[in-house]
C-alpha cells in the first residue's frame, strides 16, 4: 500500500464506485488523487470499459499522463494516453485517457453514449471552469437518459460539498484527511509605500535567504510575473533560477518550470493560478502567495470581456499553501494580513456566472437542449448572459428561431469559439479554408506582446499555428488550399462585423461598429489606418475604451465589394440646425459606422414627417408655435386630469407629449413639407382632435373656455398649472351673483379678479358672498369718492348687474 494519504481511503472509494453512479472525493493537495488513484481504480478491474480522466489544463493533462505511465513502466500511448487540442497520444490498448475539457465535450457530442467508457473522472472540479460545469451537466444527462451504468467520480482538493450534495443527494462523499507534509502558514501585508512588484520581490528574497529549498511565487498575471522577475533578478544569488509559468507559454517552456532545479541550484517559479492545479513542481517547499488573481468578467452589454484583479478566495489560499507541503514540510507566506484572509470569500465565483456563454449555448443547442433550465446545473447560467449569447449566435446566422440553422449545425461540429466556427464554416474554397484555419489558429493562441498587426502574424510560419491549422482543415475535410492574406478581411468580417472600427479624432482612437470606443497604443503603426477590423479586444478595468490587441487594416471599399451583405442602407431625413431646414440622406452603414452618405433629392412625406418628429424630440416642444389658445387648451387638459381624475385624460406634460407626437401631432401634418409649414400647424386643433368625443364634451362643459356672468357677457377663464382658474371681470357685471362661480362639477371655485371701471383690480376673492358682506363696504366707500357717476349699491348681491359704467349713460 502506498504512503500517499489517498491510499487510506482506496477501499472505501472502490466500494462507493460499485454502489453509486456518482461519487464525490475530497482529497487535499498532494494526496495522490491525480497521479496515483486512477491507476488503482484501473487495477481493481471492476470498471467495465475505459476510464476518461478530465484535467482542466493542457500541461497538467500531459504531466499526469506521463506520471501514470511511468508508474506502470510504460510510455504515454500504451495503457495510459492523453488527448488535447492539436495533440493526441493514444493507442489501441489505451485503457485510461487523460483529456482536456474541450476534448471531453467534443467526445460527448460525437458519441453521447460514451461507447466503451465505464468511468469519467472530473479532476480539480473546485476550479468550476465553464467547461467542467458543462461536462458535469452533460454527463448527468447521459446517465439519466442513455447510460445508467456509467460511473462518475468528481474529485478536488476543496470541493464545495454542500452544493454538490444538494445536486447529487444520493452520491457518497469520500474524504481523504491530511496533507503529505505540514505547512507553516504566515501572513504579512505588503508595505504600502512600495510598488507591488518591488514589495513582492523583497518579501520573496527575504524568505529565500532565511529558508532552504525552491519557491513557488503566485502572481495575478503575466505583467506582474515579468515585473517581479526583473526585481528579483537584482536580489537573489546566482544559484537561484527564475522560471515564469503561465498558460500562454509554450508547453516546452512550461515544462522547464516544473522540472527539478539542476544540482546545486534553487529555483523560483513565478506562476499564475495555473500552478494551483495538479502540477507537481519538483523541489518546492516555499510558497509566496500574492493573494491576488486576475479573472475575466464578461459584460453582456458590450459583448466584451473585462479583466479585473481581485483577492483570491480562502479555498484558493488553502490550495496555494498546500503546494509547499507536497514533497516535504514547507512554509507559505501569504502577502496580506490574517484578518484580511479571514474576510475573503470562502469559494471563488464559478466561471459560468461571469463568462461569455455563446459557446456554451451553441453546445447546448447541438445537444438538443433549447432551455438550459431543463438540465441539472450547480449554477444556472445567467439569463442576461444567455440573451447576449443568443444575440451573437443570431448575428452569426447560427439560429433559426430557437433551433440551430444548417450553418449553426456546421459551426457546432467544429468545437471552436462561435465566431471562429462561423468564419471557418463560411470558407467556400480550399484557399479560403486554409486562410480561415490559419486565422483561427492565431486567434486561439495569439502572439504575446510586440505588434498588434494580425497581418504580420499571419505572414509568420509558426509551428503551433501550422499544426492547429492542419487539424482544423482536417475537420473541414479541406485539402490543397494555400493561405491567402488578401482574403483575410473578407473572412474575418462576417464573424467580427461588430468589431470593424473607424478612426476618430486622435491617432490610435477608434469607434467600433457596435458603438463602443477602442484604442491602440499611441506608437502603434496600425494607428495610421482609418479602418481596421479588431477580432481581439480587451476591456480594461477602468478605461472606457477597449484595448485593441490584434487587428487588421481594412480597405473598406474592397470589403463592401466582397461582402455586400454586411452593409445596411437607410434613407433618413434630418433637421439641419445651422440652416433651419430639412435634409435627406441615403446612408450606407456597418452597424453604427457610416461608410457613405449621399444626398436624396426628394424624400417621401413619411420620411420628412419622421425627421420633423425626431427634431421636435431632440429640441423640445418649444420649436412649435404654441398660440395662447393652444396653451390654454393644454392647461385645461392638465387641470382636468387633476380635478376630474376618474376620467381617462391624456397626459400633456412635455415628456408625454413628446412621446406621443405620432398620436396627436402627426395627423395634423398632412401636406407639411417644410419647417415653415410646421410652424403653421394649429396645435389647438391638433390637441382637440386627439381627444375622444366624450372627453371633448366633458372638457367643454366642466372646464369651459369662458364663463357667462350675470350681464350675459362671456368672460375668458384663465387656467394655470399651479394656481386656481381665474376670471377677470368688472365688479358691476357681477352684481346679482350671490356666490362664487364653480367649475369641474362644482369642485373648483373660480378666483374672481373684480375690476374697477378703468379695468384695474379692486379685489381678488374666492368667496364672493363673504366679499359682498364684508370687504365690499370699504371698496364701495373708496370707489364712490373716485367714481361718483358709477353704480355702487349697498346690496350688490341683489342688485341688477350692468355693463354700463355710469348711472345715467
Enumerate the predicted regions with their spans.
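Structural motif
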Residues: 129, 349-356, 381-384, 413-418, ...
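Extended active-site and interfacial segments that coordinate phosphate-rich ligands
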Residues: 111-126, 290-294, 303, 315, ...
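P-loop NTPase motor module signature
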Residues: 1-423, 538, 722-724
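Charge-dense polyanion-binding interfaces
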Residues: 121-122, 250, 254, 426-447, ...
